[in-house]
């Protein structure tokens, strides 16, 4: 009887170890897996392109990340250039993307989250106020004023933002992001501009404001 119980315990431990082993993305079993963006195969990511058809262009993009972007394209005064697997298919399975962010004077990259990635953020020009908020129940704000050359980390999945403090000069930053397809959820857009819209009754109760204010925000 004792040996049978020991066997059951051993089987349970092996099962737990196996579950933990498959919980993370496996290590690469080949040099690369260039995304076949036209493949009909649906997997968690993209199917691999036939390696005999891979060229150097699959790992390259003339992104001109050294060139300033137009920050008047939206009302918040920022322009984001994301280079991910959709831009460079060779990034598939490699777990990294790069971003350039341009800020107008007093420009904002509004509160948002990357559900699949951590971000390491570097200021190239200007002075930015940045921060992130922890999960419930604390909702603690960690914030910092960054100058040229400073680096800040935004943990995976947490809401974060950047704001150009200078009313006269633009700012520039770049980020490395720990996913080839990090995703982005802009909080205001997700809540007030979902498709179809979230009921104004729900939002009015959630934010404890009059429905007229919600209707205005959703307009």
Curated annotation (Swiss-Prot):
Q: Does the record carry Ligase as a key word?
A: no
Q: Which residues form the signal peptide?
A: 1-23
Alphabetical keyword list: Apoplast, Disulfide bond, Glycoprotein, Manganese, Metal-binding, Secreted, Signal
Membrane in keyword set = no
Domain of life the protein comes from: Eukaryota
Glycosylation sites recorded in the entry for this protein? 53, 79
Q: Which GO terms describe its cellular component?
A: apoplast
Q: At which positions is Mn(2+) bound?
A: 112, 114, 119, 160
Among PROSITE patterns, the record links this protein to: GERMIN
A molecular function GO annotation: manganese ion binding
Coiled-coil parts of chain: none
Every copy of the Cupin type-1 domain together lies at: 63-215
Q: What InterPro entries does UniProt report for this protein, alphabetically?
A: Cupin_1, Germin, Germin_Mn-BS, RmlC-like_jellyroll, RmlC_Cupin_sf
Give me the disulphide-bonded residues: 33-48
Compartment annotation: Secreted, Extracellular space, Apoplast
Per the entry, what this protein does is:
Plays a role in broad-spectrum disease resistance. Probably has no oxalate oxidase activity even if the active site is conserved.
Tell me which family the UniProt entry assigns to this protein: Belongs to the germin family.
Task: Describe the protein's quaternary organization and the partners it interacts with.
Answer: Oligomer (believed to be a pentamer but probably hexamer).
- PANTHER family assigned: GERMIN-LIKE PROTEIN SUBFAMILY 3 MEMBER 3
An additional note in the Swiss-Prot or TrEMBL entry is: Member of the 12 germin-like protein gene cluster located on chromosome 8 in the major-effect quantitative trait loci (QTL) for fungal blast resistance. Partial suppression of the 12 germin-like protein genes increases susceptibility to the fungal pathogens causing rice blast and sheath blight diseases.
Q: What is this protein identified as?
A: Putative germin-like protein 8-1
Q: Which organism is it from?
A: Oryza sativa subsp. japonica (Rice)
Taxonomy of origin reads:
Eukaryota, Viridiplantae, Streptophyta, Embryophyta, Tracheophyta
């Amino acid at each position: 009887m004792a040996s049978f119980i020991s066997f059951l315990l051993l089987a349970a431990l092996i099962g737990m170890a196996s579950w933990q082993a498959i919980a993370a993305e496996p290590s690469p079993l080949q040099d690369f897996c260039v995304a076949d963006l036209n493949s009909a195969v649906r997997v968690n990511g993209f199917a691999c392109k036939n390696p005999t058809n891979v060229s150097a262009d699959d790992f390259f993009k003339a992104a001109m990340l050294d060139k300033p972007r137009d920050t008047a394209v939206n009302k918040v005064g920022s322009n984001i250039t994301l280079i991910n697997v959709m831009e460079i298919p060779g990034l598939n399975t490699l777990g990294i993307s790069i971003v350039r962010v341009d800020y107008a004077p007093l420009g904002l990259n509004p509160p948002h989250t990357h559900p699949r990635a951590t971000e390491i953020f570097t200021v190239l020009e200007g002075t930015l106020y940045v921060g992130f908020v922890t999960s419930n129940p604390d909702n603690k704000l960690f914030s910092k004023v960054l100058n040229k050359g400073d680096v800040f980390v935004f943990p995976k999945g947490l809401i974060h933002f950047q704001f150009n403090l200078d009313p006269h000069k633009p700012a520039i930053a770049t980020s490395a992001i720990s996913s080839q397809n990090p995703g982005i959820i802009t909080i205001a857009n997700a809540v007030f501009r979902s498709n179809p819209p979230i009921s104004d009754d729900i939002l009015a109760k959630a934010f404890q404001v009059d429905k007229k204010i919600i209707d205005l925000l959703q307009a």
